[in-house]
């Protein structure tokens, strides 16, 4: 297969890392932000065009956020495992290993999505009951969740396909596919809600349909590329060794992401006891704050992929330099995004719900969480650095302790003493700070740049 680097791809093994990190990260951030904006369109449209049911409808979509996040983030983590395995193989110039990993990832995504879709229909109602979703919100939330889960095969397929493209340094094709499907998502939202007078069922159907389009676009592109990641239908099967390697890296990464979502489910259950307005406010604020997270996380993904390829090629010094520059550039981008979001917070919240009480409560969340993203940047970059070397279990376990443990304990022991929205929000900076310290300790203990120094090739670090 061809090894020529095309204009929309990035050569991670040679040349300046400083210039290439943002070229990789910014399209990833744009892709994630577009995903959030299209999800936000669900919230905004039901919040503005469903009449008296607007607050209940917004709360229904928001109440599902932690559940959907847990499932999707678990598989996105596994997709990141595929990204690392493919990137390592590319660095080693082993096209056969790349081919096996690519086809394994595609089949696993579809099969895993189908399993989640079927299981989800059975457990959707019990999950929402565990979350203490208010009675007036429950039927809307259940309808949205069941429809959304039916679309899991195409949702997961898109994410695995995007991971495959990113492993070769192509972050623009996934962005383009999402842009096309996202516009379709918004148009379908408007059609179903305004023209057909549907509520949460309309935006859920639109989301599934749009994801099917983006997955189809990337699949067609993969079948037509001349790169080593080309997909051939006759080769679509699971390779045991490739799957084992993908899961060994991806499953801990997925668990790490899912732990956040699980902890957020616990927090959501506490927020749900504060009433429909608090749920709607938290949902609206989340759709704003996640934009800053998408920016910093894109540099973590860039760090993982760059380190993955260079580790495979035996360029260990270049791996350490990647981590350092990811910190610097990620910090600049995160600072800018946080400042912009805080300055425009109330206006952004009003897009989702014009209720003054919702805006006031939503601002409390943003003012508490956004400044704490400095801790988020630390553990995301360092976790991405470790994963690039195939070290995935330690970050997952430490995140489970720092995030999940602290947040569950907070809701169980601290929240009952002062049952206010602000009390719930304080757990975010505390748990994020603790996790950053734990992951930093892990890097200092593992010291991968020294541990793998013997693999360093003679190629100069340019």
Predicted features, each with a name:
Residues 33, 37-59, 128-135, 191-198, ...:
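Helix-terminus/linker motif at the lipid-water interface of multi-pass membrane proteins
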Residues 12-44, 48-52, 66-81, 85, ...:
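N-terminal transmembrane alpha-helices
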Residues 58-118, 155-174, 268, 279-345, ...:
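Small-residue-rich hydrophobic transmembrane alpha-helices
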Residues 76-79, 147-166, 174-182, 203-218, ...:
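Short runs within selected transmembrane alpha-helices of multi-pass transporters and secretion channels
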Residues 1-25, 86-151, 195-251, 307-372, ...:
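Short alpha-helical transmembrane segments in multi-pass integral membrane proteins
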Residues 55-66, 141, 145, 204, ...:
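Small-residue hotspots at the loop-to-helix junctions and early N-terminal turns
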Residues 23-42, 147, 181, 210-214, ...:
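Transmembrane helical elements of multi-pass membrane transporters/channels
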Residues 40, 118, 126, 160-164, ...:
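Alpha-helical transmembrane segments of multipass membrane proteins
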């Amino acid at each position: 297969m061809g090894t020529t680097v095309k204009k929309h791809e990035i050569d991670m093994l040679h040349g300046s890392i400083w210039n290439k990190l943002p070229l990789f990260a910014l399209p990833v951030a744009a892709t994630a932000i577009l995903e959030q904006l299209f999800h936000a369109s669900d919230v905004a449209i039901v919040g503005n065009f469903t009449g008296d049911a607007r607050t209940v409808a917004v709360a229904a979509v928001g109440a599902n956020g932690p559940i959907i996040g847990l499932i999707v983030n678990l598989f996105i983590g596994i997709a990141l495992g595929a990204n690392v395995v493919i990137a390592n193989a590319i660095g080693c110039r082993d096209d056969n290993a790349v081919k096996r990993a690519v086809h394994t990832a595609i089949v696993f995504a579809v099969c895993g999505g189908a399993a989640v879709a079927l299981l989800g229909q059975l457990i959707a109602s019990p999950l929402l009951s565990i979350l203490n979703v208010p009675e007036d919100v429950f039927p809307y939330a259940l309808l949205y969740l069941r429809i959304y889960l039916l679309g899991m095969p195409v949702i997961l397929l898109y994410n695995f396909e995007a991971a495959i493209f990113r492993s070769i340094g192509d972050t623009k094709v996934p962005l383009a596919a999402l842009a096309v499907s996202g516009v379709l998502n918004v148009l379908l939202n408007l059609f179903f809600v305004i023209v057909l007078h549907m509520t949460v069922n309309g935006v859920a159907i639109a989301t599934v349909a749009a994801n099917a389009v983006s997955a189809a676009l990337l699949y067609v592109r993969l079948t037509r590329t001349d790169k080593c990641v080309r997909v051939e239908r006759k080769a679509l099967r699971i390779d045991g060794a490739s799957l084992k390697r993908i899961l060994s890296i991806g499953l801990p990464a997925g668990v790490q992401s899912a732990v956040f979502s699980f902890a957020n489910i616990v927090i959501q259950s506490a927020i749900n006891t504060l009433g429909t307005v608090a749920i709607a406010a938290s949902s609206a604020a989340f759709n704003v704050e996640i934009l800053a997270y998408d920016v910093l996380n894109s540099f973590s993904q860039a760090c993982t992929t760059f380190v993955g390829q260079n580790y495979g090629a035996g360029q260990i010094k270049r791996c350490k330099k990647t981590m350092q520059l990811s910190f610097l550039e990620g910090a600049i981008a995160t600072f800018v995004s946080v400042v912009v979001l805080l300055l425009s917070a109330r206006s952004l919240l009003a897009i989702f719900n014009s209720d003054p009480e919702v805006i006031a409560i939503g601002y409390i969340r943003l003012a508490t969480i956004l400044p704490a993203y400095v801790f988020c940047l630390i553990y995301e970059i360092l976790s991405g650095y470790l994963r690039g070397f195939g070290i995935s279990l330690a970050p997952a376990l430490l995140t489970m302790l720092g995030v999940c443990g602290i947040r569950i304990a907070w809701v169980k022991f601290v929240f009952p003493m002062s049952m206010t929205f602000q009390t719930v929000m304080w757990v975010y900076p505390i748990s994020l700070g603790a996790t950053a310290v734990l992951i930093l300790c892990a890097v200092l203990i593992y010291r991968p740049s020294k541990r793998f120094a013997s693999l360093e090739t003679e190629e100069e670090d340019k």
